[in-house]
Design a protein with these regions (language model features):
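Residue(s) in the substrate-gating loop at a strand-loop-helix junction
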Residues: 156
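Alpha-helical segment proximal to the catalytic Tyr-Lys
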Residues: 128, 185-189, 247
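Substrate-binding pocket helix/loop in short-chain dehydrogenase/reductase
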Residues: 99-100, 104-112, 219
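Short C-terminal tail/terminal secondary-structure segment
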Residues: 3, 161, 250-274
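Active-site loop immediately N-terminal to the catalytic Tyr-X3-Lys motif
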Residues: 101, 147, 161-167, 189, ...
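Active-site helix of classical SDR
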Residues: 123, 172, 180
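Conserved glycine-rich cofactor-binding loop
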Residues: 15-17
Length: 274
């Protein structure tokens, strides 16, 4: 088990789905976690109950991260509750597939403001707290005998692979990948690691809403490994990147997709649509 004992972590968009899986897995590894959500209050409460049952501290913060000041407020409130911040996991996001001819300015701005702009401004605000944490734990955040703090951005295979109807969503993920590289270079001197996780298809409730049997079969058929991924699998990778084990690993974009971006599955029926 990865050791996150005494780690203080904020996970945005963690009331449900992949974010909830990340938050609960971090808690299993010993971290205290702030769960951010906007609409999924019932699911967020359930996530909090799981974290508390594991013996870890947890606070729920409701906010609309499409608003820049709410990004700042959320990060500050998380750090205040936890008593500092060791890691930020940027996970908040939405996808609304649309053909390019049907995309208007409101649709574009709605997705970009949450999927990318919130990552930027949450990270910007978190840096202040991560530096303070480094000074508290090591006496100097530039102390290279100290493993440092971490920012983990949740991207997607769509940052690398094209898919019909995802021109805006995929563009946000490409932006996240570029931002991760740039911010990593900028923050290395401050002893803050920045990495991204790019999941493929992950088993979450929304994925099976329309037709559980068809979607599961279709999703599994796309993946060379033969199945879709699980939220906790993304969670354990996030835990590794938030842990001291990843000290010498800044600026990486790690795909966790069952081989989707590495191989063409010749058994996939390309006439099917998700």
């Amino acid at each position: 088990m990865i050791n996150l004992k005494d780690k203080l972590i904020l996970v945005t968009g963690s009331g449900t789905g992949v974010g909830s899986g990340i938050a609960t897995t971090l808690a299993k590894c010993g971290a205290d976690v702030v769960v951010h959500y906007n609409n999924s209050e019932r699911e967020a409460e359930e996530t909090k109950e799981i974290i508390n049952s594991l013996g870890q501290k947890c606070k729920l913060i409701k906010s609309n991260l499409k608003v820049v000041n709410e990004c700042r407020r959320t990060v500050d409130a998380a750090a205040a509750f936890l008593g500092g911040l060791d890691a930020l996991v940027n996970n908040a996001g939405i996808t609304i597939p649309k053909d390019i001819k049907d995309i208007d300015e409101n649709h574009f701005n709605d997705i970009f403001s949450l999927n990318f702009r919130s990552y930027f401004f949450c990270a910007q605000q978190a840096v202040k707290h991560l530096i303070k944490r480094g000074e508290k734990l090591s006496g100097n955040y530039k102390n290279y005998n100290w493993p440092g703090c971490s920012i983990v951005n949740i991207s997607s295979v769509h940052g690398k692979l094209g898919h019909p109807g995802h021109s805006v969503y995929a563009s946000t993920k490409g932006a996240i990948n570029s931002f991760t590289k740039q911010l990593s270079v900028e923050l290395i001197p401050k002893h803050i690691r920045v990495n991204a996780i790019a999941p493929g298809t992950i088993e979450v409730p929304s994925y099976f809403e329309k037709d559980p049997s068809y979607n599961r079969e279709f999703g599994d058929s796309l993946v060379p490994w033969g199945r879709v991924g699980l939220p906790e699998e993304v969670g354990y990778l996030a835990a590794y990147l938030a842990s001291d084990l990843s000290e010498f690993m800044p600026g990486e974009i790690i795909h966790i997709d069952g081989g989707l971006t590495s191989a063409m599955n010749l058994n996939t029926d390309t006439n099917k649509t998700a």
